[in-house]
Amino acid sequence: MARVTVEDCLEHVDNRFELVMLSTKRARQLATGGKEPRVAWENDKPTVVALREIAEGIVTPEFIAAEEIVTEDPVFAAFEDENNEAV
């Protein structure tokens, strides 16, 4: 298992704050969202896997934004009108 450094991740992310947000969202997806890792799991924790994905350039802010789009979720349907606008 190779160590993941912040510098490795910052080659693919603009700043440390964005890195924190990106890695948090991805780790949460891996831990609770049922998303599959894009790198070998290697018995690591979700946070380490998320950082490895970012360091390899696999996970980007655009990737996370696409994964977060909720389509036709019945929980949110009650809060929209027929024009698909929030009530």
From Swiss-Prot:
GO terms for biological process: DNA-templated transcription. The keyword Cytoplasm does not apply. Disulfide bonds: none annotated. It catalyses: RNA(n) + a ribonucleoside 5'-triphosphate = RNA(n+1) + diphosphate. InterPro entries: DNA-dir_RNA_pol_omega, Pol_omega/Rpo6/RPB6, RPB6/omega-like_sf. It comes from the Bacteria. Pfam families: RNA_pol_Rpb6. GO terms for cellular component: DNA-directed RNA polymerase complex. GO terms for molecular function: DNA binding; DNA-directed RNA polymerase activity. SUPFAM superfamilies: RPB6/omega subunit-like. Keywords: DNA-directed RNA polymerase, Nucleotidyltransferase, Transcription, Transferase. Its EC number is 2.7.7.6. Promotes RNA polymerase assembly. Latches the N- and C-terminal regions of the beta' subunit thereby facilitating its interaction with the beta and alpha subunits. Belongs to the RNA polymerase subunit omega family. The RNAP catalytic core consists of 2 alpha, 1 beta, 1 beta' and 1 omega subunit. When a sigma factor is associated with the core the holoenzyme is formed, which can initiate transcription. This is DNA-directed RNA polymerase subunit omega. It comes from Pseudomonas entomophila (strain L48).
